[in-house]
């Protein structure tokens, strides 16, 4: 989500480009990240000049064509994915404050922006946008003028200490024609090192046409770049160093982060997708706050049935969510395929809450289900990854999954983000209705916050899974078994193989094995089994281990996904894929990832285009 570019060169050099050229082209390179507005600020003739526009970079180009910017060697630019405030010209970046002297662009979410806005308003600051970025820019201006004695680097360090959340900030000031100052925390920022010029970018795509030498910053660091050098400090002012690296891939590959496909990149994006979906949704006391849910609390307390509607992968995310929502809220919860929902005359009323899941927000089947639900008096919450799409506009309220753009047709990171957002909704309802005590909600949120790191641990072990996929590329059929939250994970694992490897695959509830599917088991049949935690409160673990014994006895090749330390599976598994220990309801965020990696490896070994599988489209906009 969002893209940032910064450039500084030398006055009077022989280059045939200026900051405007570098920054706008960098923004184009970052378009794949997804955005809804774009803008640029430059330093020229002792002043800050800027242009910004809702829409694509082409709209910004048109704005600049109408009102040209002067030549400059210093500039910053931004493509915005709306979070605080809608996708409008006013909310677009840069935000220019301090009587036009300071320009700031920002990626991320400032969690304490409301508190800071109140503080600054009391000091006489007026805000024209709805964004957290304008608040951060005004705080930087206040500190620059009152504490830092005109030192932009010091002001950025002190500002970083005041901000909470995830952010990358770039700033230029009319009083400094020789520098850009930037800060980062839990949001990417890379320095591009040139000769007589330097760059900043949210990733190397923003400057790869100009240099292959880059430096990665760590969290809570500030960098000041000039045309000839850069200096890195920590927020406390102490000196720091970055991590230099050479970019080995070309501009086209850079959009994929150096991976061979968007799907592979998006699998690797999943820790950030979950982290960003959680970001900004807790107050300073650790209480869950979903400001986006603009439905009266009395109505939410009166809900007596929840219906989740979705298609494809999103429907499986809904099936996972059902287990959690019913468990936490004690509200009957159904999951319906959106295209079947309105044709069976569902029983809905004003006490029904319909939750619609869609990555694109344009899935026609889901939109039609939502329209039918609202006609029956039900309230609708949309869980969506695309700001400004139709579904959030037609729903009563929306929760955005901040997974960033998902380019590959087969969904990966959106699936985990949808589960995460659905869990937040369930916890919020439980908190609101008094089904869970504050400490219980806090404990569950703590578990959710641990998931990005644990997902990364699964990804770090991907070579074993890739090798397995390559070795099984000639399989004719693969089966998947799971119980409880592992059942929809099994369905999703099968769907991934169907979508991108064109391989027959089926997912089953493991308890159904004796009721028919065991007839499919024959010598050499690969079967994935998602094993629940042995620390669960019921006997599901031992039952699934028995299932493994049954299929192994009939010649199946058993591929077991089990927690670290679960030794009960050792004697019955041909292959074991270990995942970190986690509470039962958190397991799908981990156990899904090996299945994605496996499917991608099988499809790649078969020579298929994993990003654009045959006959499929990313957004299904017809019924």
From Swiss-Prot:
GO terms for cellular component: cytosol. It comes from Corynebacterium glutamicum (strain ATCC 13032 / DSM 20300 / JCM 1318 / BCRC 11384 / CCUG 27702 / LMG 3730 / NBRC 12168 / NCIMB 10025 / NRRL B-2784 / 534). Its EC number is 2.6.1.16. The keyword Cytoplasm applies. Residues 2-228 form the Glutamine amidotransferase type-2 domain. PROSITE patterns: GATASE_TYPE_2 (PS51278), SIS (PS51464). NCBIfam families: glmS, PRK00331.1. Homodimer. Coiled coil: none annotated. GO terms for biological process: carbohydrate metabolic process; fructose 6-phosphate metabolic process; protein N-linked glycosylation; UDP-N-acetylglucosamine metabolic process. The lineage of its organism: Bacteria, Bacillati, Actinomycetota, Actinomycetes, Mycobacteriales. This is Glutamine--fructose-6-phosphate aminotransferase [isomerizing]. Residues 295-435, 468-613 form the SIS domain. Catalyzes the first step in hexosamine metabolism, converting fructose-6P into glucosamine-6P using glutamine as a nitrogen source. The gene is glmS. It is found in: Cytoplasm. It holds the Pfam family SIS. Keywords: Aminotransferase, Cytoplasm, Glutamine amidotransferase, Repeat, Transferase. It catalyses: D-fructose 6-phosphate + L-glutamine = D-glucosamine 6-phosphate + L-glutamate. GO terms for molecular function: carbohydrate derivative binding; glutamine-fructose-6-phosphate transaminase (isomerizing) activity.
């Amino acid at each position: 989500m969002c893209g940032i570019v910064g450039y500084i060169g030398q006055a009077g050099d022989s280059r045939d480009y200026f900051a405007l050229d570098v920054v706008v082209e960098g923004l184009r390179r970052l378009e794949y990240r997804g955005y809804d507005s774009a803008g640029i600020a430059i330093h020229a003739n002792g002043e800050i000049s800027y242009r910004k526009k809702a829409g694509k970079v082409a709209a910004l180009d048109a704005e600049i064509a109408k009102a040209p910017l002067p030549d400059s060697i210093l500039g910053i630019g931004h493509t915005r994915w709306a979070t605080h405030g809608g996708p409008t010209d006013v909310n677009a970046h840069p935000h220019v404050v301090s009587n036009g002297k300071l320009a700031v662009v920002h990626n991320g979410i400032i969690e304490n922006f409301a508190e800071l806005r109140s503080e600054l308003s009391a000091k006489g600051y007026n805000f024209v946008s709805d964004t957290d970025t304008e608040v951060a820019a005004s705080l930087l201006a206040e500190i620059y003028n009152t504490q830092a004695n005109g030192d932009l680097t010091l002001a950025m360090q002190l500002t970083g200490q005041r901000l909470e959340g995830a952010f990358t900030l770039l700033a230029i000031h009319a009083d400094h024609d020789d520098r850009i100052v930037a800060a980062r925390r839990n949001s990417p920022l890379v320095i591009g090192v040139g000769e007589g010029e330097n760059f900043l970018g949210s990733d190397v795509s923003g400057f790869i046409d100009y240099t292959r030498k880059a430096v990665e910053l760590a969290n809570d660091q500030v960098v000041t770049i000039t045309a000839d050098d850069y200096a890195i400090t920590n927020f406390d002012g102490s000196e720091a160093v970055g991590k230099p690296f050479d970019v080995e891939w070309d501009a086209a590959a850079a959009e994929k982060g150096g991976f061979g496909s968007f799907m592979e990149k998006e699998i690797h994006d999943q820790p950030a997708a979950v982290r960003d979906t959680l970001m900004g949704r807790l107050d300073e006391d650790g209480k869950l706050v979903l400001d986006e849910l603009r439905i009266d609390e009395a109505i939410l307390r009166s809900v007596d049935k929840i219906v989740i509607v979705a298609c494809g992968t999103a429907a499986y995310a809904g099936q996972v969510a059902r287990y959690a929502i019913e468990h936490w809220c004690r509200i009957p919860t159904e999951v319906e395929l959106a295209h079947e929902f309105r044709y069976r005359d569902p029983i809905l009323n004003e006490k029904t809450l319909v939750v619609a899941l869609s990555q694109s927000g344009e899935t026609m089947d889901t939109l039609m289900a939502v329209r039918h639900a609202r006609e029956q008096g039900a309230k609708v919450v949309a869980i969506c990854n695309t700001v400004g799409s139709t579904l959030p506009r037609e729903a009563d309220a929306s929760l955005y999954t901040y997974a960033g753009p998902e380019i590959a047709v087969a969904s990966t990171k959106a699936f985990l983000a949808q589960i995460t957002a659905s869990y937040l909704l369930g916890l919020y309802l439980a908190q609101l209705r008094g089904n869970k005590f504050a400490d219980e909600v806090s404990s569950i949120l703590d578990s959710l916050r641990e998931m990005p790191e644990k997902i990364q641990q699964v990804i770090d072990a991907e070579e074993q899974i890739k090798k397995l996929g390559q070795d099984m590329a000639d399989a004719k059929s693969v089966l998947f078994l799971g119980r409880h939250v592992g059942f929809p994970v099994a369905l999703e694992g099968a769907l991934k193989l169907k979508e991108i490897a064109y391989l027959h695959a089926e997912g089953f509830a493991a308890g159904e094995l004796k009721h028919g599917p065991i007839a499919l088991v024959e010598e050499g049949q690969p079967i994935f089994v998602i094993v629940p935690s042995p620390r669960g409160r019921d006997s599901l673990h031992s039952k699934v281990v028995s299932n493994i014994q049954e299929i192994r006895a009939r010649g199946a090749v058993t591929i077991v996904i089990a927690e670290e330390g679960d030794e009960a599976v050792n004697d019955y598994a041909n292959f074991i894929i270990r995942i970190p220990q986690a509470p039962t309801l958190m397991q799908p965020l981990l156990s899904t990832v090996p299945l994605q990696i496996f499917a991608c490896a099988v499809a790649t070994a078969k020579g298929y285009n994993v990003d654009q599988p045959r006959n499929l489209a990313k957004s299904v906009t017809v019924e």
